[in-house]
Amino acid sequence: SLLDEADFTADNLSDTGKGGGAGEVMIHELVHQWWGLGNMFDASDESIPWSAEGLTVYTTYRIVKERYGPSYAQEHYVDQWQQAVDNYYLNFYVRNPDYLEALPEEERLEISNSLRYVRQYCEMPLKILKAEQLVGGEEAMDRILRGLFNRELDPMYPYLTYQDFLNACGLTEEDLNLA
């Protein structure tokens, strides 16, 4: 992915889903550049939370934690992710998807996009953080991520999948359930 003018707009720099302030949003956008994540994830299945955003938000959290301390990172990242995920699972349309399907398309898309945002920007970073704890901490997770991003790519399907991540961690989907 490439930075463009949209990354420097007031709206983008104040997006609290990407960081606690403009500087942290810039960290988020630069992390996208670092990993080249836009090309590493298959975005065709929007129903799963595994995406460039989840890993980017997690990585931003790690940088912010190192820079501003664990308390700041907990308050401005982990606690906010958890609150959003808790609210997600209480959401009427998540609990009653048939009602969502009955809405007019424009409303359905707006709600679906909002719900997808929570899964990608909040649920996935929490799952990666849980994986970090289960594999033995930050250094272990750093080794796993380094291995995943330096892996031999399959030219037929070069994307990093959630199953690739789980396999590298020695975990299952059930291990990362947040309930």
Give the location of each predicted region.
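Short hydrophobic/aromatic-rich motifs at helix boundaries and adjacent loops
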Residues: M26-H28, N96-L103, Q133-G137, F149-N150
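A short secondary-structure junction motif
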Residues: Q33, L37, E66, Y88-N96, ...
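The feature captures the short pre-catalytic strand/loop hairpin that immediately precedes
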Residues: F92-S114
